[in-house]
Amino acid sequence: MDKKRVELSVHTNMGNTGSVNDTGNYINAAMRDWQPAIAITDTECVQAFPEAFKCVDTCGGIKLIYGCELYYGYAPHYDKRNPFYILAKNKTGLKELYKLISNSPKIFSLDEVDRKNLILGISIQGELIQKIIEGADDKELGKIIERFDYVLLNPIEYFGWYTKIKDESQAKEITKRIIDVCEKNNVLPIASDEAYFVFSDDGECRRILLDYMGVENCDEQPNLYFRKTDEMLAEFEYLGKEKAYEIVVTNSNLVADMIDDTFVSKVEGLGYTKAQVLDWFVRVSTK
């Protein structure tokens, strides 16, 4: 069997950003594509963790990565917030993640993050793309990227939604430039859906939610669905076959391999109730 990619960012309906699918939907989609792991990264919350744990505990065969999308800033009042991702390497990292969220998901410095037990990532569709639009050189981009372990790269159609860059060739050149800066700073560039729904057709449901939430350009949202490995490779074929495989499959698996197996369930025997399983999860992840 060919090696499969790992999606390092999915948003579930337990978050507040308009996702329409639950954790079970995503986990099933990943398993159908034989993906070895999946990261749950809701924005500013971790309410999906117990349900995700229960799904993996029931199904088995896939590594669950516990993560979250938070924000960092520079100015004392944090007028501009910049999104980034945190993934827990182990149970200690999960506990540290809980502490960060409890303190506040918007006002801590990256220097306060325990890098021993946590993995930090940033998306191209955040501070990076804004700096590029403002004319930043590679040295300035490198100063941003070097603080993270990986950078998430999206399909080209995402650029029109996040940055209003409609020129496909320009978007491709920006992606190539980010990959080059990542490699010069020993940071992993990784392809990601940053998914908000499982199937392409679910986009209409999210559009309705965004419209209800008052998002003005909701009709322009890209296809933020959970792509299979072959679909993601096709999105990045403009990089060449070898480079596309590297950022889609190789690098995503490298991050997944950084996550140890301390989250493997110890309640594999039959006969446990849902309440017992969730109680076990809370106890082992907070003690």
Regions found by a protein language model. Give the residues of each.
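Phosphodiester-processing cores and adjacent nucleic acid-binding clamps
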Residues: 1-287
